[in-house]
């Protein structure tokens, strides 16, 4: 396990260009299936204390409800290793936790299995509404390809912890 960040949070990875096969998930879009992995700092983090400044979309806020519980259950059923996805109890994420922020509750679970997960990850969801990609990483047009075909378009994500105005940028 990595050390607990000394600051409020630390962005670790971003899954961008999350184009989904329409045959597997009719109606699914890139903006519904992108994800950001981060680790919380030394404080307990409430869902209401987090805000993302997406480079290419508006922030819709985080949601934890029956829909997110169902999604978490479906995704947990794909795990064949000893990992576990959990929603934050009472909307509170413990210090030093690995967190995965999914950009929509309209995600395509069939296209996002967690088969080989071997760790515990707190799973949180942005409220639905954004369908275009959050990062606008490449100009691929309508082309789905294993490598980007368009020109690079650098963007930055800022994830903020409101109580202390602390943030991380990736």
Regions found by a protein language model. Give the residues of each.
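Disulfide-bonded cysteine motifs in exported proteins
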Residues: 2-3, 77, 103, 161
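A structural motif detector for short, solvent-exposed N-terminal "entry" segments of globular domains
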Residues: 2-58
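Sequence contexts marking disulfide-bonded cysteines in secreted/extracellular proteins
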Residues: 7-9, 18-20, 24-26, 81-83, ...
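Extracellular structured ligand-interaction cores
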Residues: 11-13, 31-35, 47-49, 88-90, ...
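Conserved beta-structured recognition patch
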Residues: 47-57, 121-170
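Short aromatic-acidic-glycine turn motif
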Residues: 56-68
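Intrinsically disordered, low-complexity Pro/Gly/Ser/Thr-rich segments with frequent PxxP/GP/PP motifs
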Residues: 69-109
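Short, Lys/Arg- and Gly-enriched loop/turn segments at beta-strand edges
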Residues: 104-130
């Amino acid at each position: 396990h990595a050390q607990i960040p000394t600051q409020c949070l630390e962005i670790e990875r971003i899954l961008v260009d999350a184009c989904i096969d329409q045959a597997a998930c009719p109606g699914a879009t890139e903006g519904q299936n992108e994800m950001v992995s981060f680790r919380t700092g030394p404080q307990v983090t409430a869902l209401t204390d987090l805000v993302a400044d997406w480079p290419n979309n508006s922030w819709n806020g985080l949601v934890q409800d029956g829909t997110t519980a169902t999604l978490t259950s479906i995704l947990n059923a794909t795990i064949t290793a000893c990992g576990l996805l959990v929603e934050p109890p009472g909307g509170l994420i413990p210090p030093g936790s690995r967190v995965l922020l999914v950009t929509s509750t309209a995600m395509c679970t069939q296209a996002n299995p967690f088969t080989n997960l071997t760790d515990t990850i707190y799973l949180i969801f942005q409220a639905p509404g954004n369908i275009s990609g959050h990062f606008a990483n490449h100009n691929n047009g309508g082309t789905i390809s294993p490598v980007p075909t368009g020109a690079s378009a650098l963007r930055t994500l800022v994830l903020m912890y409101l109580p202390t105005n602390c943030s991380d940028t990736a």
